[in-house]
Amino acid sequence: MDESSLVRFVFLLCLVSSSVFCLAESDQNATVSSAVYIVTLKDRPSVHFSGRESSDSKHSLTATSSQIYRTLNRSASIIRVHDSLLRNVLRKENYLKLYSYHYLINGFSAVLTRKQADRLAAREEVENVVLDFLVEKATTHTPQFLGLPRGAWLRDGGSEYAGEGVVIGFIDTGIDPTHPSFSDKISGHTYSVPPHFTGVCEVTIGFPPGSCNRKLIGARHFAESALSRGVLNSSQDDASPFDGEGHGTHTASVAAGNHGIPVVVAGHRLGNASGMAPRAHIAIYKALYKRFGGFAADIIAAIDQAAQDGVDIINLSITPNRRPPGIATFFNPIDMALLSAVKAGIFVVQAAGNTGPAPKSMSSFSPWIFTVGATSHDRVYSNSIILGNNVTIPGVGLASGTRIMHKLVLATHALRNGTTVMDAIYVGECQDSSSFDQKLVQGKILVCSYTVRFILGVSTIKQALLTAKNLTAAGLVFYIDPSATGFQMTSSPMDIPGILISSPQDSQALLRYYNSSLLRENGSGKIVGSASVAKIVGGMRPTYGITAPKVMYFSARGPDPEDDSFVDADIMKPNLVAPGNAIWGAWSPLGIGTNDFQGERFAMESGTSMSAPHVTGIAALIKQKFPHFTPAAIASALSTTASLSDRKGEHIMAQRTVLNPDISQSPATPFDMGSGFVNATAALDPGLIFDIGYNEYMKFLCGINGSSPVVLNYTGESCSSYNSSLAASDLNLPSVTIAKLVGTRAVLRWVTNIATTATNETYIVGWMAPDSVSVKVSPAKFTIGNGQTRVLSLVFRAMKNVSMASFGRIGLFGDRGHVVNIPVAVIYKIAV
């Protein structure tokens, strides 16, 4: 196989919290003689030999020991085949096998030369050779905002039972096992380890014996690819499941952290925290590291192990930073491994990405993956400063206030003798106390400039606070510099009175007042002080009731790209949206993921990384109530019950720009929010579900033009074994997307009644047609009993030639209170 025949793509995976930036791509293989390759074989992996999905699988809690034994025996056989192949082809040459993948995909990763990779690729039993690719790192109130205490939790017996018996696997940066959010001794209700979980707790110097318990029931780390490249420093990068970054600890706590854990930050008590499913079990698969991120070979190994261990749900707060090349975005090693995970009955949740708000910015592609975008919620921490002229200026900042008025001093007016602005060009940011004269600052409120360097992480609020404390200032106030205008500010913790004024207009009002009160030396006109005074009110108490939810500007948007040429897929993404802005979660005190919360045990983070675990936790509640639900059934329950309105009953809005996002917003479409905003209580009683299985996904993949050899590469299955193919719009999804409607198209949907009562329910069908499209649904009325399935015919006809996307909804309204919501999107319309 020549070089052009190798599947060569490199794309970053980002931990999608909005404070982290992705690194640029690089092709390391141009400068080294060997590299890590991912090799897949034609034969099928272990999970494909079960021939079962969900309810009969290991993940149903009913798997027999003989089933597990057969799976393990098959896995051992696959590993022997891998070793034999390497010995036979490479003989006594130098190579290093890193992993055998045997459960979800049949293959291995190894350090090879290009010639060795070519020789393996030429073997009949080998289907694919892919270069490893780089991966990189991208609540106290949300349970109440989502209605869990009086809704979904009550249905499960309260917070002490919510998520009981469900295992969530997190592919992330690890976990801090000492955090009380993961203790198994919080309540008197004893945890019991689910018998279907067979994972282990790795013991290292950084993760000593006793780190795991009956809550945190498994922990491993994966770094063979990183080690082979020499980029892993065992001491600096925590070569253990311990979280030295903070991100993994945060996401795990949002989904499944214990209920009622006190949140204390910068010495301030800020309420109590809880995960969405506080009784769910946690299994950690660390594959990303604080200094360099990680590599796909390690990510795939983590996913493969999580599935083999028996997790019920996988949370992925990572996404590629660009579309995978090839005939379709769905064909990449991670998504294809996750397809096998779905076959094993595992529900997979992935963050949409933080590349919004532009259209087609979606970073999660495949229909078997549940993709979550980010919204705001209704809690804010309001702060303000009262000036001596009786003007009150609002701002943000988790800080106490000053009880009395204090004089103000601008940073550039408090320099030491001999120090000038030219000597320290960034002195206005207050990053170095040695630049200032303490006598000029002591007992006053120090006024500093908040520039774009803070947004980039070059300067930090924490360092400015240290400066203010070293100078014994009475408080600290930031005004917004023009370079940072338009960026959305969050409430940073401050251990002295402080405030960040985020409005340019209010910042100018502060400076005008200060400058109007300047004191100058007679004769020289030199500034010797200011008569201006102010009082910081403080921002420790949250306020509620703002318009929420709204889709955040950073949340990636649809339509879902089918390939890297901007062709749109007939798949709706995101699936729905959930809280992802200013989310409190557990944090590792050693974490370096955010400057503002270093050394703290909780942090407030934003990003679709935070949205995904909200849905992961709610999915655990559904899995607890319906243990035999397929992944598609869980996805359907979440989607069809989603809310379309904000707390005021108005249509959910979506921010449209990065700068000044609250000024530029409009009603959210399905390409912004999918089915809508997650409704935890309704999702536990959806009435009807749209189910779909592995075979349907395979028929869909086989229907993509030119896909047969690629499908064989990844699954070991031939498209010829499937009697038919399915267009994407024909998948039995709880949504309809038609990228190009030429004339008329009819699609079918199957709904199954899973109501807990045996009584029949009669549904009336209603719809709102997209612009320039006519819609007809039949039957328009039907009665369905428990466990029964009905087929719905949906016919769409283009009325005009229009190239702009338009949206509609189909609703199924049951006489027992169930409402099933089906979003519709049609992009190109060509009337015939």
Swiss-Prot record:
GO molecular function annotations of the record: serine-type endopeptidase activity
Enzyme Commission (EC) number: 3.4.21.-
SUPFAM superfamilies on file: Subtilisin-like
Keywords: Autocatalytic cleavage, Glycoprotein, Hydrolase, Protease, Secreted, Serine protease, Signal, Zymogen
Main subcellular localisation: secreted
GO cellular component: a single term: plasmodesma
GO BP, sorted A to Z: proteolysis
Prosegment residue ranges: 25-138
Pfam families referenced in this protein's UniProt entry, alphabetically: fn3_6 (PF17766), Inhibitor_I9 (PF05922), Peptidase_S8 (PF00082)
Domain Peptidase S8 positions: 145-684
Positions of the PA domain: 408-503
Cell compartments where the protein resides: Secreted
Signal peptide: 1-24
Domain Inhibitor I9, chain residue ranges per copy: 36-136
Residue spans crossing the bilayer: none
Glycan-carrying positions: 29, 73, 233, 272, 315, 390, 417, 470, 515, 522, 679, 705, 713, 723, 760, 801
Catalytic residues identified in the record: 172, 247, 609
PANTHER family from the UniProt entry: PROPROTEIN CONVERTASE SUBTILISIN/KEXIN
Family: Belongs to the peptidase S8 family.
Protein name, as recorded: Subtilisin-like protease SBT2.1
Annotated gene: SBT2.1
